[in-house]
Swiss-Prot record:
Principal subcellular localisation of the protein: cytoplasm
One protein family per Pfam: Cytidylate_kin
UniProt: ATP binding residues: 11-19
Enzyme class of the recorded protein, top EC level: transferase
Keywords from the UniProt entry: ATP-binding, Cytoplasm, Kinase, Nucleotide-binding, Transferase
Organism: Bacillus velezensis (strain DSM 23117 / BGSC 10A6 / LMG 26770 / FZB42)
Name of protein: Cytidylate kinase
Family note: Belongs to the cytidylate kinase family. Type 1 subfamily.
GO annotation, cellular component aspect: cytosol
Primary gene name: cmk
Reactions that this protein is recorded to catalyse: CMP + ATP = CDP + ADP; dCMP + ATP = dCDP + ADP
Length: 224
């Protein structure tokens, strides 16, 4: 029987992490943990309560009082905040554009990492984010770092948003993704960076199926 591995998939905004991670988890019958959704959930909660996203102490305290659940359903995964389904709300631009502000706080990240490590401790998980291979699951057997050009990532996000009926502008998305890259890469706590033992995959000219296929091949090799 194949050994149950921990799979860490990192990369910048809109590199295809979540989509690929879901496919890999489904093919392997592993649990998928979308850490980005957890940061989006606290950002959404703070915005809803008119909390100051730059106030680290207040945001950390709010997070400690907030229950965030990732629930598997036949269609994928739903995100609950204190029992309320916020799956759609957390994907809106208002949250996307401000999640990096909430995610840069040390107190917030420490609490999130603690929760994520508890979720991933038994193996058999696929976890995606910015600091999974470097910080959350540093001992993961499989570490992947996905890359894609800013233009390609903006194009993907544009098409994704159009499908959902959101009003979007391609040039604005390029600016927003570049700004998020800068915030994620330059933050003091757990910045976006590739783990030394991660395998890098440039997804710019690859389909989602091709990227998932490459990762599954790596997983098969490590499972033996």
């Amino acid at each position: 029987m194949d050994k149950k591995l921990s799979i860490a998939i990192d990369g910048p905004a809109a590199a295809g992490k979540s989509t690929v991670a879901k496919i890999v988890a489904e093919k392997k019958s592993y649990v998928y943990i979308d850490t980005g959704a957890m940061y989006r959930a606290i950002t959404y909660t703070a915005l809803k309560q008119n909390a100051d996203l730059t106030d680290e102490a207040a945001l950390t305290e709010l997070l400690k009082r907030t229950e965030i659940e990732l629930v598997s359903v036949p269609e994928g995964q739903i995100v609950l905040v204190n029992g309320e389904d916020v799956t759609e709300e957390i994907r809106k631009d208002e949250v996307s554009n401000q999640v990096s502000i909430a995610a840069k706080h040390k107190g917030v990240r420490e609490e999130m990492v603690k929760r994520q490590q508890q979720l991933g401790q038994k193996g058999g998980v696929v976890m995606d984010g910015r600091d999974i291979g470097t910080h959350v699951l540093p001992d993961a057997e499989v570490k992947i770092f996905l890359l894609a050009s800013v233009e390609e990532r903006a194009k993907r996000r544009y098409e994704e948003n159009k499908k959902k009926g959101y009003d979007v502008n391609y040039e604005t998305l390029i600016e927003e993704i570049a700004r998020r890259d800068k915030l994620d890469s330059e933050r003091e706590v757990s910045p976006l960076r590739k783990a030394e033992d991660a395998i890098e995959i440039d997804t710019t000219s690859l389909s989602i199926a091709e990227v998932a296929g490459k990762i599954l091949e790596i997983v098969e090799q490590k499972s033996r």
